[in-house]
Amino acid sequence: MSDGNMDVDESPVSWKVKSLEKLIDGSSFSSTLSRLSSSSRLIPTSRDFHFYYNFDEFKRPIDEITGTSQSTLATIGDSEQVWGKSMKFPGDVDDVYAEDWLCNVNDELIERFDVSVDEFQRIRKKEKEIGRSVVADDGDDGFQMVYGKKKKPVGNVVTGSAAVNGGGSVIDVKMAERDKNSSGKAKVPFHVPTIKKPQEEYNILVNNANLPFEHVWLERSEDDLRAMHPLEKFSVLDFVDKDVNEMEPVKPLPLEQTPFKFVQEVKDLKELVAKLRSVEEFAVDLEHNQYRSFQGLTCLMQISTRTEDYIVDTFKLRIHIGPYLREIFKDPKKKKVMHGADRDIIWLQRDFGIYVCNLFDTGQASRVLNLERNSLEFLLQHFCGVTANKEYQNADWRIRPLPEEMTRYAREDTHYLLYIYDLIKLELQRMAKDDAHTDSPLLEVYKRSYDVCTQLYEKELLTENSYLHVYGLQAAGFNAAQLAIVAGLCEWRDFIARAEDESTGYVLPNKVLLEIAKEMPDSVGKLRRMLKSKHPYIERNVDSVVSVIRQSMQHYAAFESAALSLKDVSPGNVMDKNIEPISEKKDLHTGDVASPSLKENSSQLESTRDLIMGAANTNEGRGLGSGLFGSAKVSAAVRISKKPSSGLGALLGNAASKKKSRTDEKVKEDVKLEQIRSSVNLSFHSFTEKVPDSKSTSETSPKVYGKPEEMSSTMPASVSKEDGVKELKDDSEEASEIVGTSGRVSESKVSSSEMGDIILLENGDEKKVDAEDEPMSLSELSTNFQKCFKSMNKSKKAQKQTEFLNIEPFDYEAARKEVKFGEGHKGRQGKREAAAGQKKGSTQEQSEFGQGKRRQAFPASGNRSMSFKN
């Protein structure tokens, strides 16, 4: 009776608490997990499972377990009140999507548990600080997402600091507590996902078609080929300020004392237009969001006059801003002061059809003044002594209504800008007097501002090569199949982004895109498992993404050439390419020596090539042509490779590199031979009796050069030390002989280790070789060849005699007489010790002084060291 009353009186919450305590009890919980783990090992897997499944004794319990599990999972999936969304179970545990569904459910549960634990710890910490129980946390400054919670409105008041949008719905955002470890700065979110998209909230229509943007508010040129900006009717001189020295800077009122109005209605916009018509200058700035829109979305427009500040809600008044403000911004008599207006100008054109005339860009002015920094934050501190809070610069400006901190930040962007404009003009005027510039610095600022205004907005278009511009692709080193996946996913995300009016970075970030292409997941399960974070559009279209991957992999052949091109221009391969030691158009008497591979490089490699060429084109490199070929008519058309080759260095006879390690050890031998064979073409102009170039025939062809005056360090030679070089003088009778250890030159190949001997001619011989005054007859030519062959035969015979001069058969009889049998260990050991040069005596001496120490092969531990002595 009492137990029953206790059960009845016990609340559901307390019962759940007791159940959880019982579950996580140390002994029972761990033992349950242990038994479960042990029993799972008994279940057969893979082939064994299918074998046992043929027997009813195994099949029946398995079917029961399957049915129970499937029913339980279906119940979990149908609980929309728990998940807040539909998570229906696929219907069959054997379905390929069942595993993915289970992974998603587990991820959702774990995430909710983590959020709940963090919230619980935060509340407990606050309770300890204040000493009393806390039900919910009041809002502080900043913003923070709170999982699954919304502030409930009480009447027309929103509790805490949650925001109510124009439609009366509560935005799921609350002010976050300040971070004590970051000097009290609030945590400002870059993206608040719970904000309803302004495109849907305010019915903003955008044209994301893959077509060029049309500037419908501009006049066309006479040939109708381009749009004409209103500024083209004016000159820069029309906007330059006159009598700057007589101007007195107007200091602004404090921010708190300046009248301020948040413009959200058309009547307020009309009042703003009337105010702007009565002033000569005003400051403008825009706040923008690029993350949740394909082309971008202007969120706010800040305008300040000398006496008032305005913030225009560009969401609610989007269709009215252009008609009311277009003529004001176009008026050349009204000065518009902006800071860093490069992007603001095109945003005004895109969203409102507004084209600015008569602009003064303080960002360009700071560059002309050569200030320490060019940011607005620096200008505020430098000219006004105001420390701007720039942490809201990248905040999510779609939030409505604006919190007080963000409103203040938006006002500061334009409130002080006209005063900065006054001070900068004076600085520019002083700069002109001090430096005596040919062009006025003030005029230079207006020229730059003029150029900023005349740029026109262009929509991002998808082309067949758009995927090549993905950040990080060139360094990824993808093959053709991976590159095909990149192209397919780029096209898919572009289509989704245009249709949903989302940025491509939100639909599929570049980093995730490259990771998918690298892994090439061909199933839904593989794709889900590799994603480290949630991406809404991938989860909604996971089947489409996998289909794109599969289809792209089937058409990889079309991307072979693109993959090779990307590998050629990758940073690693660029530095591995051969270095051109001579400038591209270096005349070596035989024509220009230019590397075709350099001319074929794309524009993306220009800076890298210039860096390499700058390091290679030294004075020594330039002297190479003049030193070797400057005074000789015997010319060689050599295409110098960009990276020095040892074979080519040996060909040029640079003996300095004999002391250096070979630079081409990593290059295959056949590649080196092919490079030398294709790049060297020697032409001999004449043959003389005193210099019979006998080996210039088809069998042997030694290379003839003038004696080098300067040897370039950029052309390393790798001639073997055994190769001989013989200088031929004027009266030498042995001019036809070529001395070398090898005695011959390879008939078809020239390499670093098998180079023929190089004949170095002195200056007198060069003149004889170069003399071509008298033509040579065929008989003389035949005589020269015969003499060459005779000298070659003499050389070969002499070499053969020297090679086999001392060869005699081994005398075994004499060897037997030298052998004395019966001498034991002492004699042999003494001979070995004497031959080795060891300072050891006989066995008696060794026993007297003890055994010498030996280097141990193992650490001295235990009996390991003793084994060396025994």
From Swiss-Prot:
User: Which Cys-Cys disulfides exist here?
Assistant: none
GO biological process terms, alphabetically, are: exonucleolytic trimming to generate mature 3'-end of 5.8S rRNA from tricistronic rRNA transcript (SSU-rRNA, 5.8S rRNA, LSU-rRNA); gene silencing by siRNA-directed DNA methylation; polyadenylation-dependent RNA catabolic process; rRNA processing
> In what ranges is there compositional bias, type Polar residues?
840-849
Which superkingdom, per the lineage? Eukaryota
**Which keywords label this protein?**
Cytoplasm, Exonuclease, Hydrolase, Nuclease, Nucleus, RNA-mediated gene silencing
Q: Which CDD domains match?
A: Rrp6p_like_exo
Name a Pfam family for this protein: DNA_pol_A_exo1
PROSITE patterns from the xrefs? Answer: HRDC (PS50967)
Q: Which residues cross the membrane?
A: none
The 3'-5' exonuclease domain, residue ranges: 263-428
Q: Cite the InterPro entries for this sequence.
A: 3'-5'_exonuclease_dom, HRDC-like_sf, HRDC_dom, HRDC_dom_sf, RNaseH-like_sf, RNaseH_sf, Rrp6-like, Rrp6p-like_exo
Tell me where in this chain the HRDC domain is found: 479-559
Where found in the cell? Answer: Nucleus; Nucleus, Nucleolus; Cytoplasm
Give the GO cellular component terms, alphabetically.
Answer: cytoplasm; nucleolus; nucleus
Q: Which stretches of sequence are listed as region Disordered?
A: 583-605, 649-668, 688-775, 821-870
GO molecular function list: 3'-5'-RNA exonuclease activity; nucleic acid binding; nucleotide binding
What does gene deletion cause?
Answer: No visible phenotype under normal growth conditions. The double mutants rrp6l1 and rrp6l2 have a late flowering phenotype.
Q: Where is the composition biased (Basic and acidic residues)?
A: 720-729, 821-834
Question: What function is annotated for this protein?
Answer: Acts as an important epigenetic regulator through multiple silencing mechanisms. Involved in association with RRP6L1 in the silencing of the solo LTR locus. Controls levels of non-coding RNAs (ncRNAs) from the solo LTR locus. Seems to function independently of the RNA-mediated gene silencing (RdDM) pathway. Functions redundantly with RRP6L1 in the regulation of FLC locus. Participates in the maintenance of trimethylated 'Lys-27' (H3K27me3) at FLC locus via the regulation of antisense long non-coding RNAs (lncRNAs) and the regulation of diverse antisense RNAs derived from the FLC locus.
Its protein name is Protein RRP6-like 2
Origin species, per record, is: Arabidopsis thaliana
